């Protein structure tokens, strides 16, 4: 869960290698709510029988549901309040299901102070029963404008 307190970082406060993370327990209700909100009611996301017939364990969470969780990290933790998302590129190498515990991580890869631009690396992995990293479920890059 993302805390309600928003971080307020100026471009000069953001350093290479800075990391923000969260652990998220995926709930079936979130998948259903996202299907309604987005209008993406593809049976792969909302029909367990169909998803299983297609070779999946159950309904697959929308990739952009993970993207929305990353958005919460950007807007609340790193870079925080002054973040204006300009570009987001994500790949989803493995499926996510209700009940999965996902570790999302954002890392500062580059800071262009003169332009007010920050590049972030994003990753998400399933956690095992022992909180060990498992398969990667999302990876990508984000470019944010840091407002003054």
What are these regions (language model features)?
Residues 76-100, 104:
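Mid-chain, well-packed structural core segment of small domains
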Residues 42, 92, 132-134:
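Intrinsic-disorder/low-complexity coil detector
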Residues 1-19, 96-148:
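HotDog/MaoC-like acyl-thioester-processing domains
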Residues 21-25, 91, 143-145:
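Generic structural detector for well-ordered beta-strands
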């Amino acid at each position: 869960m993302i805390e309600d307190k928003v971080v307020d970082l100026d471009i000069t406060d953001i350093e290479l290698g800075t990391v923000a993370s969260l652990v998220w327990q995926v709930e079936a209700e979130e998948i259903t709510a996202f299907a309604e909100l987005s209008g993406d009611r593809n049976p792969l996301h909302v029909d367990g029988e169909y998803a299983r017939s297609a070779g999946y364990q159950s309904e697959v969470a929308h990739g952009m549901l993970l993207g929305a969780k990353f958005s919460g990290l950007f807007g609340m933790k790193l870079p925080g309040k002054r973040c204006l998302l300009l570009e987001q590129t994500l790949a989803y190498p493995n499926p996510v299901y209700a009940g999965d515990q996902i570790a999302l991580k954002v890392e500062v890869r580059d800071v262009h102070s003169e332009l007010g631009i920050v590049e972030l690396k994003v990753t998400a992995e399933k956690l095992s029963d022992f909180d060990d990293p498992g398969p990667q479920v999302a990876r990508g890059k984000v470019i944010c404008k840091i407002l003054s």
